[in-house]
Amino acid sequence: MKTEKNAQLRLAKRPQGEAGPDDFELTHDQVPSPRDGEVLVECHLLSVDPSSRTHWNAGQSYRSMVQVGQVIDVGVAGRVLESNHPDFSAGDYVVGPGGIHEFGVIPGDQLTLCDTRIAPLSSWLGGLYMTGLTAYFGLLEIGQPKEGETVLVTAASGAVGMVAGQIAGIKGARVVGVAGTDEKCQFLINELKFEAAVNYKSLTLYNDLREATPDRVDVIFDNVGGPLLDTLFRRLAIGARIIVSGATSQYNNETIY
């Protein structure tokens, strides 16, 4: 292991607008060794989420920014190779914050043990990790949907949106999704059993929304922001709740909408 190289993707420079290949650098370094309380993880799966884009800018955010030269930070799931933390042993599968690399040293206190008998490793990094928890707590603690209410989810075919829509359905709400293609809208209706779905690129967007939400909208779970959210405001019911989960339409913009 000590002679094996560790492929890592680093931030070469801060992107201007949409990120491209020149903004990143692939390096090959020595595999690191864990210190006290740390765990060496062989990364099998990476969760590269839209919110990662916000960490590559200059300035401040709700979390620390990736500095130029640093490894791009993402959620990872993988196998423990070496552990200096009492809760983990070699061979365990874990999920937690890491980077785009083959091998990473992660503080054990930031890792969760994955029982792959309960769910596959991909689920531990998806619906049972950050995207699923974002949907779960955002919808239930802030949205608090009630049976019979209308819940509208933007970016509904994305990782967070799909889970939010399923939870809303379990709670007995009427679920409407917004997505960017007709194929995604059909997926929401046919596979995820949304009551209705609207393509936000439609030339008749507001009329489509009005038809899909005849009783207006009680809860908006918004992952997109920008002009689309402005349009959705016009469909709000009295006493409506809005979960501001993300703003994917704005992550590549240099100016705030």
What is the predicted function of each stretch?
Residues 30-48, 56-100:
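Glycine-rich beta-strand-centered segment in the early N-terminal region that forms part
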Residues 72-82, 89-155, 197:
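NAD(P)H dinucleotide-binding glycine-rich loop of Rossmann-like/cofactor-binding domains
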Residues 93, 150, 174, 240-242, ...:
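Short glycine-centered segments of the SAM/dcSAM-binding site in methyltransferase folds
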Residues 101-102, 180-188, 254-257:
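Short, glycine/polar-rich helix-capping loops at beta-to-alpha or helix-loop-helix junctions
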Residues 125-203:
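Mid-domain Rossmann-like dinucleotide-binding core that forms the NAD(H)/NADP(H) cofactor-binding site
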Residues 204-215:
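Short amphipathic alpha-helix with an adjacent loop that forms part of the alpha/beta core around
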Residues 227-257:
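Glycine-rich phosphate-binding loop and adjacent beta-alpha segment
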